[in-house]
Structures are given as C-alpha cells and as structure tokens.
Amino acid sequence: MPDTFFQPVSGFELPRFAGIATFMRLPHVGLLDKRLNDVQIGLIGTPWDGGTTNRPGPRHGPRQLRDYSTMIRAENGATGVRPFELVNCADLGDVGPNPADLHDTMARITDFYQKVK
C-alpha cells in the first residue's frame, strides 16, 4: 500500500489551477522535514541564470516547471502505470542561489545536495 502522503493532490480535491504549485502537485518536503528520509525521488529546483550568457531567464525555470507540471496525471494513459504508487516522490524546494557570486552559488548547491543525501 503506497504512502498517501507522497501522492499528488487529486484534481477532484483541489483544481489544478489552485493551491501552491509544487512539482507534479507532490508534497513539499523541506530539508528539515521529518519525512525527508522517506523520500525516494526528490525534485530540486536551481533558479539561476549564471550558467548562460545572452539568455536571461533560466532562473524562472523551476517555478514554471512546477506550474506546468500541475497537468501531470497520476496514471499514464498509455501504459496504465501509476508511478507515484511505486516510489515516494516529493518536491524538495529550491536551492537559494547568490546571483552576484558564482562561487557562493556553487557552494550553496553543493551544500543543499549534501544535506539531501
């Protein structure tokens, strides 16, 4: 029996356009959350433009993916697979970058991922 905490919010329970956007309408589990060790697949955003030149905007990617992913369904229509019943997935939030300091941003990303391990 899958842990219902890690199931996406149903569109029947809360319309897809409502609520706080998380990746695929999964629960948000922060680094200090007691359920962090139960997460098997954690989705992490890194809203940062420093990896591109002449193309600002990647910093908006994680937020947009969260918004667009609200349309994901709990069951794959072609295969019938219900992936969220197979593993515990959660949105672990964003790494907080330092837009003015590349080295500090890399240290923050490294620190965030080490805390997730």
Segments predicted by a language model, with ranges:
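Metal-dependent C-N hydrolase catalytic cores
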Residues: 2-117
